[in-house]
Amino acid sequence: MSIKVTQEKLPASRVGLQIEVSGEQSRQVYERTLTRLSREVRFPGFRPGKVPRPVLIQRLGETALKANAIEDLVQQSLESAIAQESIPAIGNYQLSSDFETLVAAFQPGESFSFEASVDVQPTATLAQYTGLTVEVAEVPFDANRVDNVLAEQQKQMATLVPVEGRNAAIGDVAVIDFQGILVESGEEIPGGSGTDFQIEVEEDRFIPGFISGIVGMAIEETRTVDATFPETYAQEEVAGKAAQFTITLKELKTRDLPELDDAFAQEASQYETIEELKTALTERFQAEHESEVKASKRDAILTALADQLDVEIPESLLQREISAMINETASRLSGQGMDVRKLFTEEVLERLRENSKDEAEQRLRRTIALGELAKVTETQVDDEAVKARAAELLSNYPRPQEIDRDRLNTVVREELLEDKLLEWFEANNSVTFVAPKAAETEVDAASATVETTATETAEEAPEAPKAKKGKKKA
């Protein structure tokens, strides 16, 4: 289809198109539309494809026929215009002309003009990619982590024995009955009651005031305890509100901890001695720390690159990235056993899309910045390197025949290219580690991610954590 096309550059990586179609082409499309509809519609007394044209026009109406023809003509004309002008289009087009006006003006056999716009691949430039100074927040290594993990494992493997001759203290395990009300209204708290409820008497295990109210109680004692739900509590109907709990202490237990010896190691893990277990934990935590350091450095470098990027991200690309983020979150939550169909209601999805815009844009800016760095530095990945890495990954997978090899090669190539680009950046810029700022360690409630926004709808009413049993393999 030969057509006349006038292009206009629009903001946000869009191109406006003024398209003119000849009278002969408008006639041909109209005729094809009538032929298609005559095959598709079903009228009593006529076989499919045998509906006479006058009957078709009378039954459907001239306006409806023109509207169908224009839809076909616009779609075909846009596809031809994009191909003819070599426009790097992404996403769907948007009709700028008023559709009803087009229908009223359309005459088969006469020239037809309309305006539309389409998103295109963004043009990006890096203002600077050498000589930059990048500060990376240090990731401290917790030297006590092995001891803390073993201590927690001791608790899980401990034997609970009844407490005699004293009142409840921090570190105990209590069995309680409790019932809560909101002070202001006197109404019962949804989910705020329980019978024979086992709770660890540990600070910060429940809402402020609850645990401190249990401390000092005697068995069979009943107390009224004042507590307050945090302002940031997941259930909005009780967040920030004062509550009263009537608590009866029915049983009190303490933990008889096992010794940290070889027998402990054999029961808690696949290792024969406690020293082997400690060594394995140390090596694992050191490897995790190295990964965290690498991730911190990657994040800082990509942020620095994105800050140097000049680009207008098209809306269709942004929405596509948001959809990808939501799908990733849905996949993770589904893997955790959550019913995402119930979780992702229409209201939740709308909120997710809105809350995800900033993160999606930053992800796109990082991806585009890396792509531009690869162009200007002419960095590529050797096919043999991709093949070797893919083979290594497949060797560690129990069912390699189930893996999509093309997809695997694509992912491997992207990862190897990113590694090479990050190495190049480090060699040509100043990348230094600095102590993390205090503000960076605080939780910013306003910056909710896709996953936190999604999962907060699944939060239940306050529930005290129960004492854990069983063993955990190291």
Curated annotation (Swiss-Prot):
GO molecular-function terms, A-Z: peptidyl-prolyl cis-trans isomerase activity; protein folding chaperone; ribosome binding
Biological-process GO terms, alphabetical: 'de novo' cotranslational protein folding; cell division; chaperone-mediated protein folding; protein transport; protein unfolding
EC number: 5.2.1.8
Keyword Magnesium (UniProt): no
Major localization class: cytoplasm
Catalysed conversion reaction: [protein]-peptidylproline (omega=180) = [protein]-peptidylproline (omega=0)
Record-level GO cellular component terms: cytoplasm
Keywords, in A-Z order: Cell cycle, Cell division, Chaperone, Cytoplasm, Isomerase, Rotamase
Pfam families in the cross-refs: FKBP_C, Trigger_C, Trigger_N
Region annotated Disordered, chain positions: 441-474
Keyword Cell division part of the UniProt annotation: yes
Compositional bias segments (type: Low complexity): 444-456
Record-linked InterPro entries: PPIase_dom_sf, PPIase_FKBP_dom, Trig_fac, Trigger_fac_C, Trigger_fac_C_sf, Trigger_fac_ribosome-bd_bac, Trigger_fac_ribosome-bd_sf, Trigger_fact/SurA_dom_sf
Domain of life per record: Bacteria
Domain PPIase FKBP-type: 171-258
Cellular compartment(s): Cytoplasm
Domain free text: Consists of 3 domains; the N-terminus binds the ribosome, the middle domain has PPIase activity, while the C-terminus has intrinsic chaperone activity on its own.
PANTHER family: TRIGGER FACTOR CHAPERONE AND PEPTIDYL-PROLYL CIS/TRANS ISOMERASE, TRIGGER FACTOR-LIKE PROTEIN TIG, CHLOROPLASTIC
HAMAP family hit by this protein: Trigger_factor_Tig
Family that this chain belongs to: Belongs to the FKBP-type PPIase family. Tig subfamily.
Function recorded in the entry: Involved in protein export. Acts as a chaperone by maintaining the newly synthesized protein in an open conformation. Functions as a peptidyl-prolyl cis-trans isomerase.
Name of the featured protein: Trigger factor
Name of the gene encoding the protein in the UniProt record: tig
